[in-house]
């Protein structure tokens, strides 16, 4: 196998990730893949901001990040959430290392709109050489979405965006979105494979609805460059079976017949 696989864990599912999830990461690595995990941490940041009585607002889904908010975000993402994921991986027998985009200039960013969003950045460069070195040595890097600009100032970055940038920079073959659902269901049955066109049809007919719509559209948007497949899996269960098969819904560029 030997391919880079980027796994994005949203903040909303981090606390509920089961032992089976971490076992699946170990199994994926044992099959020869080279996993890299990118995590969010929105709910944990919200909780700490509330505890410290720091106000926070959102603009078009992005957290407006002032000096105070950034300090809390960096503390929670890098110091708490990141290390929690690393410890759970190590407990499952996975050699892992926790990093942020600041470490080794892993994720260089530029401000999106400082006047409106404050210290919120978008990736302009990923240090793929460092990540390749780590995975070649058997590590699973766990990345917190804090990056630095050209002046080495920290910026808050959307975790989905970081995952996409890492996947592109390292020419990953697959990007896995870890959610709280098994994948896309139709008539209560898991749909194992779809094309982007089939996804849009399921949205139009109402099979895909609510919070799943932005998840699948984000997945489709990620299908660029060498990325051949984006999968949606359940973090509360095994997502990589002993047979070597991914359990979830995989969206691929090329035409797939999901039935039969």
From Swiss-Prot:
Main role? Catalyzes the ATP-dependent phosphorylation of N-acetyl-L-glutamate.
State the family it belongs to: Belongs to the acetylglutamate kinase family. ArgB subfamily.
- Protein name in the entry: Acetylglutamate kinase
Q: What class of enzyme is it?
A: transferase
Keyword field = Amino-acid biosynthesis, Arginine biosynthesis, ATP-binding, Cytoplasm, Kinase, Nucleotide-binding, Transferase
Q: Copy the pathway line from the protein's UniProt record.
A: Amino-acid biosynthesis; L-arginine biosynthesis; N(2)-acetyl-L-ornithine from L-glutamate: step 2/4
Recorded hits in InterPro entries, A to Z, give: AceGlu_kinase-like_sf (IPR036393), AcgluKinase_fam (IPR004662), ArgB (IPR037528), Asp/Glu/Uridylate_kinase (IPR001048)
UniProt-listed CDD domains:
AAK_NAGK-like
Q: What is the lineage of its organism?
A: Bacteria, Bacillati, Bacillota, Bacilli, Bacillales
Give me the residues that bind substrate, please: 41-42, 63, 156
Tell me the NCBIfam families matching this sequence.
argB
Compartments in which it is found:
Cytoplasm
Reaction catalysed by this chain? N-acetyl-L-glutamate + ATP = N-acetyl-L-glutamyl 5-phosphate + ADP
Pfam families with a match to the protein in the record: AA_kinase
């Amino acid at each position: 196998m030997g391919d880079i696989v980027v796994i994005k864990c949203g903040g909303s599912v981090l606390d509920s990730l089961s032992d089976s999830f971490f076992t699946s990461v170990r199994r994926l690595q044992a099959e020869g893949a080279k996993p890299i995990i990118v995590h969010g941490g929105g709910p944990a940041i919200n909780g700490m901001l509330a505890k410290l009585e720091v106000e926070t607002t959102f603009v078009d889904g992005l957290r407006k990040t002032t000096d105070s908010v950034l300090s809390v975000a960096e503390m929670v993402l890098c110091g708490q959430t990141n290390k929690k994921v690393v410890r759970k991986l190590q407990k499952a027998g996975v050699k892992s290392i926790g990093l942020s985009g600041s470490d080794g200039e892993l994720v260089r960013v530029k401000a999106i709109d400082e006047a409106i969003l404050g210290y919120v950045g978008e990736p302009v460069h990923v240090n793929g050489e460092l990540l390749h070195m780590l995975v070649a040595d058997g590590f699973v890097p766990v990345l917190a979405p804090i990056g630095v600009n050209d002046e080495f100032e920290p910026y808050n970055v959307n975790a989905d965006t970081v995952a996409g940038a890492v996947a592109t920079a390292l020419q990953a073959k697959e990007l896995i979105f870890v959610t709280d659902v098994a994948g896309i269901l139709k008539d209560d049955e898991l749909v194992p494979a779809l094309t982007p066109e089939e996804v849009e049809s399921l949205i139009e007919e109402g099979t895909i609805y609510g919070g799943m719509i932005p998840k699948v559209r984000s997945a489709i948007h990620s299908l660029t460059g060498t990325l051949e497949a984006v999968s949606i899996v359940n973090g509360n269960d095994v997502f990589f079976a002993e047979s070597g098969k991914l359990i979830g819904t995989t969206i691929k560029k090329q035409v797939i017949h999901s039935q039969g």
